[in-house]
Design a protein with these regions (language model features):
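Membrane-interfacial helix-loop segments of redox and metal-homeostasis proteins
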Residues: 1-157
Length: 157
């Protein structure tokens, strides 16, 4: 008796789900730690050598965690997951630009991140962000590098 498995393993879908899951954990942790210590988060942002940051910090103190929570919603949704990954990449890119400004300023400023992530130095933050930027792009890169090739002999028809 010959039993054939018709279940198809889709590595791209697994990668998409894994990337989304890691970003959900990141955004959830980041948003709740910022909201839990809102005062410190805003006060540290106000120290940044960025024009108008002193005035915009209270607004960013709400907008950033709300954006992170909205990204969680997109990443949970199968329909909007890819959009959530792209927007996660863009938010991480904007954080990376901010971190680069902090590094280039030469000032020893506290990190505005919350929780355990705030223990990282600015250089470690760049590596951390670059890693999560790669995680957010990995499903798209995988599709480009390894496009599906269908052949008449394929067992996954």
């Amino acid at each position: 008796m010959d039993i054939k498995c018709k279940t198809k393993f889709d590595f791209k879908e697994l990668l998409l789900l894994l990337s989304a899951s890691l970003l959900i954990l990141l955004w959830g942790y980041a948003a709740f730690s910022k909201l839990a210590d809102y005062g410190r988060f805003v006060a540290q942002m106000q120290l940044a050598p960025v024009p108008l940051m002193n005035h915009l910090a209270p607004v960013f103190g709400i907008v950033i965690p709300v954006t992170e929570l909205a990204l969680i919603g997109l990443l949970f949704s199968e329909r909007f997951r890819k959009t959530g990954l792209w927007l996660s990449f863009l938010l991480l890119l904007s954080f990376t630009v901010y971190i680069s400004i902090m590094l280039l300023s030469g000032l020893r400023l506290p990190c505005t991140c919350g929780g355990l992530i705030s223990k990282l130095g600015w250089r470690q933050h760049l590596i951390f962000n670059a890693s999560f930027m790669l995680i957010s792009l990995l499903p798209f890169l995988w599709s480009r590098i390894f496009p599906k090739v269908y052949s008449p002999r394929s067992i996954y028809k």
